[in-house]
Amino acid sequence: MIRRLLPRTLRARLTALIILSTAATLALSGVALYSALHNRLVGMSSYEMSATLAAMRTHLANVANVDDIPRKSDLWIDQLHGHQNLDLAIYDTDGRLRFATRGFVAPRPALGAPQTRVPASAAPAGATFSYLADDAPLRGGNPRTARIVVQYDGKNDHALLRAYAYTVVVIEVLAVVLTAALAYGIAMLGLSPLRRLVARAEQMSSSRLAQPLPELDTSGELKEMEHAFNAMLKRLDESFVRLSQFSSNLAHDMRTPLTNLLAEAQVALSKPRTADEYRDVIESSIDEYQRLSRMIEDMLFLARSDNAQSHLAIRTLDAAAQAERVAGYYEPMAEDAEVSIVVRGKAEVRADALLYHRALSNLISNALNHAPRGSTITIECAQAADAATISVSDTGRGIEAPHRERIFERFYRVDPARHNSASGTGLGLAIVRSIMENHGGTCGVDSEPHVRTTFWLKFPAHAA
């Protein structure tokens, strides 16, 4: 509810919050000060009334008879000490007035005799007067007591409180107005680094993503935001570079088979040919069509796998048994290449069976393309407490260090100059990485050139 009432802009919102907090603080302070002053005035009036009442009791103790009370009017007036807000009256036990100062106003209803030794007090509703009454013993005579009533006129106190309240309200209103102006200026000053950051961000373009925003004279949260923004620009630049390379590689990989198809068709149509010759051209074109088809299927798979995590059919698999099954598919090709495939170790993985097969299949296919004749491809299954690791190793040429970080990128090839379009689509390892990300796992490669290259898949023990 409060968020909906606040302005939408950060500058206006900061200004409004500062004004509201200041107004609330001033209001609470004003109420507290007003209450303190009121309590102080009430305490002072109560003290003066009590002191006057005590003095009157002392002097009445020297009076022999109530008939002597009017004769000592000067003494009773002296007990007020010239206090203009105090008045008093003395009654006998029958309630007859024996003495009263000029400003005394009898309370309505009249104060009854105290039932205890505590003086009775009263403050009639709507009046500015307050009263304090008590019985005082006389020295002798009949009756032996008189009733003293002390009156306090709080008119001046009320006027002081009204003036104080008015002054406080005026000061607080002026303070809120001044605070509003200062808050707006503070918000403008505080957000100036943010405006400079926005102005520089507006100058950014796709060709300048590699240039981070210059360091601003900021600290704290704005410095963190500046670093986060520059980090985002770096990631965007890397994404644009990968996208540009992807587009370039895609165009190159599709151009080669299309160029071959076009050249074969043009040669076939350059002169009349026999049916067998046309058949040879068509059969030759099938390989290129199949390569294009595989490339399109791999690209569609990658596009679908980006949002496929929630659709995985996760179950516990015997990693070694499944690896034996996948390796069996490649036995004929391994025999032709004079390469053997060996599965070792035991492990259990939590994975989608079809995707596990595809990831392992891509790694075995990649190893077959690089393993020398007479060598062995080793599939190792290892179980740990927090993960299961499946690795595929071969003894081919290996991968130099600069290429290992990018080997799983789409269409990335270690040696583009030696790339043969018939050898694959260039998406196999990218598919492996996508499958592992969907399983919450990781993949990587360790290579010692001309000695051993190992691609590994690490599945977490509790995959989603």
From Swiss-Prot:
Record membrane topology: Multi-pass membrane protein
SMART domains the record matches: HAMP, HATPase_c, HisKA
Residue positions where Phosphohistidine is found in the record: 252
Transmembrane regions: 14-34, 168-188
Protein known as: Sensor protein IrlS
GO CC terms, sorted: plasma membrane
Keyword Phosphoprotein appears in the UniProt entry: yes
Domain HAMP as annotated: residue spans: 188-241
Reaction catalysed by this enzyme: ATP + protein L-histidine = ADP + protein N-phospho-L-histidine
GO molecular function, one term: phosphorelay sensor kinase activity
PANTHER family associated with the record: SENSOR HISTIDINE KINASE YKOH (PTHR45436), SENSOR PROTEIN (PTHR45436:SF9)
Enzyme Commission number: 2.7.13.3
Tree of life domain: Bacteria
Function: Member of the two-component regulatory system IrlR/IrlS. May be involved in invasion of eukaryotic cells and heavy-metal resistance. Probably activates IrlR by phosphorylation.
Enzyme class: transferase
Keywords attached to this entry: ATP-binding, Cadmium, Cell inner membrane, Cell membrane, Kinase, Membrane, Nucleotide-binding, Phosphoprotein, Transferase, Transmembrane, Transmembrane helix, Two-component regulatory system, Zinc
Matches recorded under PROSITE patterns: HAMP, HIS_KIN
Cell compartment(s), UniProt: Cell inner membrane
